[in-house]
């Protein structure tokens, strides 16, 4: 029985090593095999043939990041809700209650963000 567990961990270890090794090898080979001919034209930014007239480093207000995080949270919620909605007939009442608890937890978080006035635009 122990060999089954060891086998499972060995597969995970192999995938972990391959997941690290293959990108490192690909990036290293790409760096060694690519032509390296730096020039001033390659160092400039290019957008529609027009030279840039100001610095590309722009600071964004922190509220934009909060909106982005809230979007990601509710986007992931739809990823969890979709398989549940597809298999709704087979899952039964327990899955309905479980999903309702999940949605209520997210709505409580949204209500908390609303109460703290996080959702007000600048």
Curated annotation (Swiss-Prot):
**How does this protein sit in the membrane?**
Multi-pass membrane protein
Pfam families in alphabetical order: Oxidored_q4 (PF00507)
- Gene3D superfamilies documented for this protein: NADH:ubiquinone/plastoquinone oxidoreductase, chain 3
Give the enzyme's main class according to its UniProt record, as a single word: translocase
Listed A to Z, the keywords are: Cell membrane, Membrane, NAD, Quinone, Translocase, Transmembrane, Transmembrane helix, Transport
Please give the Gene Ontology molecular function terms for this protein: NADH dehydrogenase (ubiquinone) activity; NADH:ubiquinone reductase (non-electrogenic) activity; quinone binding
- Which GO cellular component terms, listed alphabetically, does the Swiss-Prot or TrEMBL entry include? NADH dehydrogenase complex; plasma membrane
Where found?
Cell membrane
EC no.? Answer: 7.1.1.-
Catalytic activity from the UniProt record:
a quinone + NADH + 5 H(+)(in) = a quinol + NAD(+) + 4 H(+)(out)
Q: Which residues cross the membrane?
A: 10-30, 66-86, 91-111
Q: Which domain of life is it from?
A: Bacteria
Q: Which HAMAP family match?
A: NDH1_NuoA (MF_01394)
Would you identify the family this protein belongs to, as annotated? Belongs to the complex I subunit 3 family.
Q: Which proteins does it associate with, and in what oligomeric form?
A: NDH-1 is composed of 14 different subunits. Subunits NuoA, H, J, K, L, M, N constitute the membrane sector of the complex.
**Role, per record:** NDH-1 shuttles electrons from NADH, via FMN and iron-sulfur (Fe-S) centers, to quinones in the respiratory chain. The immediate electron acceptor for the enzyme in this species is believed to be a menaquinone. Couples the redox reaction to proton translocation (for every two electrons transferred, four hydrogen ions are translocated across the cytoplasmic membrane), and thus conserves the redox energy in a proton gradient.
Q: What is this protein called?
A: NADH-quinone oxidoreductase subunit A
Query: Gene encoding this chain?
Result: nuoA
